[in-house]
Amino acid sequence: MEAFATFKKELSSPKNIFITTHVKPDADALGSSLGLANYLIKKGHQVTVVTPTDYPYFLTWMKGNDAVLDFSKSSEKVEAQSRLQEADLIFCLDFSVLSRVNELGELIRKSKAFVVNIDHHQDPEDFADLRYWSTQAAATCELVYQLIVELGDESLIDKDIAECLYAGIMTDTGGFRHPNTTKNVHLVVAELLDKGADSSQIANLIYDSNSVNRLKFIGFAITRRLVVREDIHTAYFVISKKDLKKYQSQTGDTEGLVNYALSLDGIKLAALFSEREDGIKISFRSSSDVAVNKFAASYFN
């Protein structure tokens, strides 16, 4: 409670605010970052959003996208470092350990700014002055909405903010199909729709903006790279760097691929193993009766 009181006091006057999220941001990561940024700008703060890496092209419609700094680009890194050094408050969104932001992690750890961590993932690292965290939330965007309401500023949520937050909730619930689609999710989404969020347009922008190469890649992956083990109710994809290069893969092109494996009848656990320059990225999905999060936490960083 004391930390939240300090946080509210910090926000009571204009501040330099730095917002960041995890590598390869998805809709919840970018939506929560830009939704929060647009709200704080309306409150009179100077806000900078920095991502550790690039993010999918189908998220660039969000308001504030043009001002986002990509820390992995040398042309933007110096400015991002300067903004971090000037920050009075730092918001860390949609990640629970500082290793998820690459080089930015140690810079944040050393900063004297007030650090706020907003996240819904399990086992958070203790690096923040204020942890606004709940595994009961379906998405970080849901928590950002809750925070704005708790601060008494629900009236400041406009169409642009609502659409950023809606996008993150929609995708992190699998289009409102996953077990994390709670009553509260529907209540929050109803409020965002009342604020002007266009659900049909957002779905089209995220799910129906495929390039020809991406569709060909998905077809290739399903026909040539899908392994099904019916005996253990498991299916998985193994994608090499060569595969990604062949189809001129862009950031976000593997997004949602693992869901095709989970959609198979009788499959309870699905995985995607994707070879990258810096290692193997693994994505897991499971049915409600398989605790894949505990498995991932036990065996992977």
Task: Map each language-model feature to its residues.
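Generic enzyme active-site microenvironment
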Residues: 20, 24, 92, 117-118, ...
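Active-site cofactor/cluster-binding pocket
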Residues: 69-130
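Short glycine/serine/threonine-rich phosphate/pyrophosphate-binding segments
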Residues: 27-33, 98-102
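Glycine-rich, phosphate-binding/catalytic loops in enzymes
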Residues: 35-37, 107-110, 133-134, 187
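Short, hinge-like loop/turn segments at secondary-structure boundaries
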Residues: 64-68, 110, 133-136, 288
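Short glycine-rich anion-binding loops that position phosphate/pyrophosphate groups of nucleotides
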Residues: 23-25, 95-98, 121-123, 241-242, ...
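Short alpha-helices
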Residues: 118-188
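Hydrophobic helix-and-loop "lid/oligomerization" segment in the mid-to-C-terminal part
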Residues: 2-20, 31-63, 69-71, 78-81, ...
